[in-house]
């Protein structure tokens, strides 16, 4: 059986991980918005526009991959930690679902 201090320590770690992930997602969104705002095509032609769209598409795909990787890492860690966390009234699946819900809410913001 884990002591209350150990449970608090584990919960603190989980919250820190969630906060870091939310901060990273927000930071990636700010970068994307900044890239979108800084696009200036001097002599608009089809090639220049296509090149800029291609760069944006590539950056967006990298952002999506980073988010998916973070979700997978968090989910894996939550499953591992869920086996060691005993919170009265919550199952491992409920703890994992809480973590995923926090990520979804942060992603919507």
From Swiss-Prot:
It is found in: Virion membrane; Host cell membrane. One of its GO terms (cellular component) is virion membrane. Signal peptide: none annotated. Its main location: virion. Changing residue 19 to C: Complete loss of ion channel activity. Residues 28-109 are intravirion. InterPro entries: Flu_B_M2 (IPR006859). The record marks 19 as: Essential for channel activity, possibly by being protonated during channel activation, and by forming the channel gate and the selective filter. The keyword NADP does not apply. GO terms for molecular function: channel activity. Residues 1-4 are virion surface. It is a single-pass type III membrane protein. The record marks 23 as: Seems to be involved in pH gating. Residues 58-81 form a coiled coil. Changing residue 23 to C: Partial loss of ion channel activity. Keywords: Coiled coil, Host cell membrane, Host membrane, Hydrogen ion transport, Ion channel, Ion transport, Membrane, Phosphoprotein, Signal-anchor, Transmembrane, Transmembrane helix, Transport, Viral ion channel, Virion. The chain crosses the membrane at residues 5-27. Phosphorylated by host. Influenza B virus genome RNA segment 7 encodes the M1 (AC P03489) and BM2 proteins. Normal translation produces the M1 protein. The M1 termination codon overlaps the BM2 initiation codon in an overlapping stop-start pentanucleotide 5'-UAAUG-3'. Termination of M1 translation triggers reinitiation on the BM2 AUG in the +2 open reading frame. Forms presumably a highly low-pH gated proton-selective channel. Trp-23 may function as a minimalistic gate that opens and closes the pore. When the environmental pH is lower than a threshold, the BM2 channel would be activated and selectively transport protons across the membrane from the extracellular side to the cytoplasmic side. Crucial for the uncoating process. Homotetramer. This is Matrix protein 2.
